[in-house]
Amino acid sequence: MLSKIIGSVVGTKNERELKRMHKVVSKINAYEATIQALSDEQLQQKTEEFKARHQNGESLDALLPEAFAVCREASLRVNGMRHYDVQLIGGITLHEGKIAEMKTGEGKTLMGTLAMYLNAISGKGVHLVTVNDYLAARDAELNRPLFGFLGMNVGVIYSQQPPQEKVAAYQADITYGTNNEYGFDYLRDNMVFSLREKKQRPLNFCIIDEIDSILIDEARTPLIISGQAEDSSRMYALINTIIPVLIRSKDEEANKNNEEEDFWIDEKNRQIEISEKGYEKIERFLIEVGELGENESLYSPSRLPLLAHVQAAIRAHHVFVKNIHYIVDDGEVVIVDENTGRTMPGRRWSEGLHQAVEAKENVEIQAENQTLATTTFQNFFRLYDKLSGMTGTADTEAAEFKSTYDLDVIVIPTHEPIARIDMDDQIFLTKLGKYKGIIREIQEIQAKGAPVLVGTATIEASEELSYLLDQEGVKHNVLNAKQHEREAEIIAQAGSPKSVTIATNMAGRGTDIILGGNWQSFIEDIDSVSPEEMQRLKAQWQIKHDQVVAAGGLHIIGSERHESRRIDNQLRGRAGRQGDPGMSRFFLSLEDDLMRIFAGDRVVNMMRAMGLKEDEAIEHKMVSKSIENAQGKVESRDFDARKNLLKYDDVANDQRKVIYGQRDDLLAEMDLLQAIKIMHQEVYNAMINQFIPPGSIDDQWNVDGLEDELENEFKIAMPINDWLDEDRRLDEEGLRAKLIQTALDRYDNRREQMGEKEAAQLERHFMLQSLDKHWKEHLTQMDQLRKGIHLRGYAQKNPEQEYKRESFELFQMMLGAIKSETVQDLSRVHIPTKEELAALEVQQRENAAHMQMQFEHSDIDNMDGGVERAAVQGRNVVAGAAGAGVAGAMAGNGNNDNEPNPYAGMNISRNAPCPCGSALKYKQCHGKI
């Protein structure tokens, strides 16, 4: 209440910001006459002038008014488009590191050129991020003439791009690309073996198009580079056979304590729970087929992977639905993005879910992957010195943008007042009744001559509605994940008179629907068009445009409410662009998922008590309020999940920064000798402590054990007993110093035999190899820790604090293992020739080159015990060769029988891949020690 009173007096924060920016716009406009008077050559020279002024200390803020005026004039001369004042405000917003909410059709692409031009003056690079390769290439080509005129070069990055071309794209003043590609390049850059192989420059300024889609909808999307793990396809196929005989509870809430059912599903959170009866049935089946011993349980430490297979299979059969969450295309399970309706070829759900769905659909079951490097969009984009974004719908998520990314949202006024009319929702008892209501509405709109866009939430809904329209003889086009290749053609004419287009959620499609249709699409297939023919086509289009305007513009029909208000607003925003007329209305039924799961019983009972017929609808404020409350609950739940993820990922992110920083230091450091000597001292000290405890007397010493360990681990024969016999005064401190100095002297001799340059090369090789290997193992351990950490809550412990504590301990152990292995390898390796060293580098690069792009879709919400909601969020994976490296070939025996097992106590399945990266099963490697 107080904030409303204050706002009415001094204006809202958004109003105050707009008022401040209007003053800057006045300064920009004041330059217009002067800039217009310049010749093309003089206008182009302004860029070099700005660069010189900036290098001499003038800030970009100070340059902004004149630079924006120059960019606006250049745009008018090159493209015939002049930035409106509201677009100038948007450009200021982006430059200041904020989010500009600008409605559909208001010119976000043109607006972005202002901030991109200004920030490119610094020479540090500007990244424009889009949601797909098509938009990146389209926008780059669209703006290349403008930036070229101003002396700026433009680059585009894409998957599978030749290395030199990608480097050139990143060196450009302005670079376009997708969020996935920027993120993967960051991870790949931290797996190179030379600084020359890095592609990216330091991350300077970033503008994210459709920022809500990338930083909210995909916030829980880990970017992962992975290698292939053990093939478990037989197990997935086996578990798949038991799922049909498990009994699901019909009334999830009422039967949670009913032991007659085998499992139940919490649809609100998409979680599953198996009853005691269900566990017994599953265990009996696994015992019968020989996968479980008579006295074993699914909760036995070595059998937990089996339990994960079962849970994934139940979710595959009962949570993930064909033609809603995925389609089967050419023998492959392809995920459908619930927010956009697009298929995502190559993406895969993680943690066994995708394999379980493949088993369910009886297609080839592909192998799982092991993580080699990972980050999230949340943490990647926070690496930029300055981050900004633009979208048509951000204000509903303003609180999350501020708390997570420290980004303010500025709502930019429209150039023309919005003429679209948003009608009240119509609510029906049944889905069929709702579809009948939609068809009546379509027929009425068609009779007026207006175009209709029907938005559906799923492929299944679009096909059901299409079938009913066919039955009624209504011509229409369908745009969903199965017709994406016709997308441009369908959208181009979706604004034509009487056209009917059914589309799954249109978020992020990046194409405006023009009233009357897109006349330019008519001439794309014609080789040459005369000026007269061009004028005739334009005149025909103008007639159609005027007809549609007279009929009320584009009419939007939503076939159900989305869980997020933002997606609903994106659908509404397809109509009413740049002051055009339009209308929107949502049709709902009590059978819709949102209504069925979240709407209160009061609403359902009230509608049924009214005695409505199937095709009768009501419009009631209480129902609308109930829907808004339901959407608010879902948005709040998703926000909490993203916030929860960030708490855990921030721990991994801090460790990632340390490892990547050390890796860069290794690549940049010419002389590693001092670091190697310190490493030797630490490793030998730690080993000596095991056999000669600090402050101990000689009766407590295990000298024979120390001699054996030095021989086994480092191939060093030290006559410690002889030293003690020769010098009775040699105490613990003196002996320690002599041992370490002897080891260092021995290493100095080996370096002399190798040669300074060759020794430095070998040191860098072994340190990099050990760091990469143990970081990969550490990521696997962190993933295992995260999956089970929620169980600490049952012991009255804080899972988050426990995760931080244990992950730190794992990190310290990893650093110790890196040092120990590096010293071991350097001590045991035979002195290589120059040819062998060259072969090492070649093999390293070949291993890196084997990586292939693959995506995996997952939710990582299991910190709190939840199951995957992977239809909503995603997980991206790059699959690659995950070999154990080349050190083993040079270092002689890898594991000997006297080595302690570093993975003891970790409850690793004996048939699982050994965490050391040897590619052997655990029972054949460290597990047999």
UniProtKB/Swiss-Prot annotation:
Monomer and homodimer. Part of the essential Sec protein translocation apparatus which comprises SecA, SecYEG and auxiliary proteins SecDF-YajC and YidC. ATP binds at residues 87, 105-109, 512. May bind 1 zinc ion per subunit. Part of the Sec protein translocase complex. Interacts with the SecYEG preprotein conducting channel. Has a central role in coupling the hydrolysis of ATP to the transfer of proteins into and across the cell membrane, serving both as a receptor for the preprotein-SecB complex and as an ATP-driven molecular motor driving the stepwise translocation of polypeptide chains across the membrane. One of its GO terms (molecular function) is protein-exporting ATPase activity. It comes from the Bacteria. Zn(2+) binds at residues 914, 916, 925-926. It is found in: Cell inner membrane; Cytoplasm. It is a peripheral membrane protein. PANTHER family: CHLOROPLAST PROTEIN-TRANSPORTING ATPASE, SECA INNER MEMBRANE COMPONENT OF SEC PROTEIN SECRETION SYSTEM. GO terms for cellular component: cell envelope Sec protein transport complex; cytosol; plasma membrane. Its cofactor is Zn(2+). Its EC number is 7.4.2.8. It catalyses: ATP + H2O + cellular proteinSide 1 = ADP + phosphate + cellular proteinSide 2. Belongs to the SecA family. CDD domains: DEXDc_SecA (cd17928), SF2_C_secA (cd18803). This is Protein translocase subunit SecA. Its main location: membrane. It comes from Psychrobacter arcticus (strain DSM 17307 / VKM B-2377 / 273-4).
